[in-house]
Amino acid sequence: MKILHVCSELYPLLKTGGLADVLGALPQAQNQIGLDARFLLPAYPAITTGIPNTQVVAEFDNFAGHVVLRYGEYNGVGIYLIDAPHLYGREGNPYHDAYYNDYGDNYKRFALLGWVGAELATGLDSWWRAEVVHAHDWHAGLCVAYLFNKGKPAKSVFTIHNLAYQGQFSYHHLYEIGLPTGMFHVEGLELFGQISYLKSGLFYSDASTAVSPTYAQEITTPEFAYGLQGLLSGLKAQGRLVGILNGVDENIWHPNVDQYIPHHYKLKYMAGKKKNKAELQAYFNLPQDESALAFVMVTRLTEQKGVDLLIESADEIVKQGGQLMILGSGAPHLEQGIRELAERYPQNIAVKIGYDEALSHLMVAGGDVILVPSRFEPCGLTQLYGLQYGTLPLVRKTGGLADTVVDSTSESIKARTATGFVFESATPEALRHCLQRAFALWQKPRAWAMVRTDAMEQDFSWRKAAEQYRTLYERL
């Protein structure tokens, strides 16, 4: 079965979020189980630098101007690149300029991505024709509208990585992107008087997936649906919206092979974890105290990620003699808030503003607890990394966090199902109480070790997700 993944990011070449991690691993896992999966991406500078050896597949002019379609390989997976420098030849973030202004021609840049995706199902490459087009997030959402307009020459799947980003543009652009005006309708592309690329993906695809079962349920409610609850609940009722959990790329995120950490370890030999903890404490200039419960947080600093909840409850960590290390950047007032915490408690709390891939790995390997107190979280990857590394996740019960972490209660510990700590209300008080429970378990080393073992034995491999996607494709 020939699968074309239409997307806008690819780890490690170009990443703004978890979407890149998914595309960096899923097609490879699918090929390992016998599918024939390829990518389609815009030829951004970061992508072409990483994939220098390509051949021309097609050359044409359309609504977006002159375009060359190239083909190459990356990590053993075939990849098509849309070479249109006037649209994609921009350094840095693929969606906005250095001042965080969205590019004014994004409607055309991502319409072209969708258009080429549909053409690859109708013979644009005479040697390979997609049988299933799998579009990811709003950037690729128009792809399934173009497929629909062509009489659906291939089956289609649309994956929602984050519903908050909808790709909305003026309906005036419809004339410029080669779609009939009849598609601009509430039963089509229209959302709040604009074209919604995300709604296009949902409405016209044969099936949509969310990146966890709980998130698939949550987005049918007004609180999470951003005005799309009617469409989404209808899709769910028809069996056209399902949740499939993301996986962990074990070539990159496994404590026994991780290239970024100084001391490897595995379930049967955990000595390296203690050594990584000491290295992490030294990096952040905190006391190298093995007995201090070390909390880590690697995140975008936004309210969505619950950073404000942590700021208001972090004194609990200090009071109990724990340590807190934070890596991330984001909203200026939250950056300032965590800086002030570190200044107030220099023996217990340390912060690095920015992003550092190597440090993020050391934090996951060296921490005892990884904090993910999100208000909403479609899937979440950091809690999965925590499970893999025996760094117990402390999470809020939402989205993929609810699907992947089992709270440590006396019953669940005894049943050997506990894998972390879970709280429900998005309040500082609820988070504070959960922190207290983590400290209580830390005082029972044997119980802590049991939970850590059960966490590390969880299977969130990409092979498992690849099998679930294959089952979905086969029933379309």
UniProtKB/Swiss-Prot annotation:
Its EC number is 2.4.1.21. GO terms for molecular function: alpha-1,4-glucan glucosyltransferase (ADP-glucose donor) activity; alpha-1,4-glucan glucosyltransferase (UDP-glucose donor) activity. Gene3D superfamilies: Glycogen Phosphorylase B. Belongs to the glycosyltransferase 1 family. Bacterial/plant glycogen synthase subfamily. The keyword Transferase applies. Synthesizes alpha-1,4-glucan chains using ADP-glucose. It is an enzyme of class 2 (transferase). Pathway: Glycan biosynthesis; glycogen biosynthesis. PANTHER family: ALPHA AMYLASE DOMAIN-CONTAINING PROTEIN, GRANULE-BOUND STARCH SYNTHASE 1, CHLOROPLASTIC/AMYLOPLASTIC. GO terms for cellular component: cytosol. ADP-alpha-D-glucose binds at K15. Keywords: Glycogen biosynthesis, Glycosyltransferase, Transferase. NCBIfam families: glgA, PRK00654.1-2. GO terms for biological process: glycogen biosynthetic process. The lineage of its organism: Bacteria, Pseudomonadati, Pseudomonadota, Gammaproteobacteria, Pasteurellales. CDD domains: GT5_Glycogen_synthase_DULL1-like (cd03791). This is Glycogen synthase. InterPro entries: Glyco_trans_1 (IPR001296), GS/SS (IPR011835), Starch_synth_cat_dom (IPR013534). It catalyses: [(1->4)-alpha-D-glucosyl](n) + ADP-alpha-D-glucose = [(1->4)-alpha-D-glucosyl](n+1) + ADP + H(+). It comes from the Bacteria.
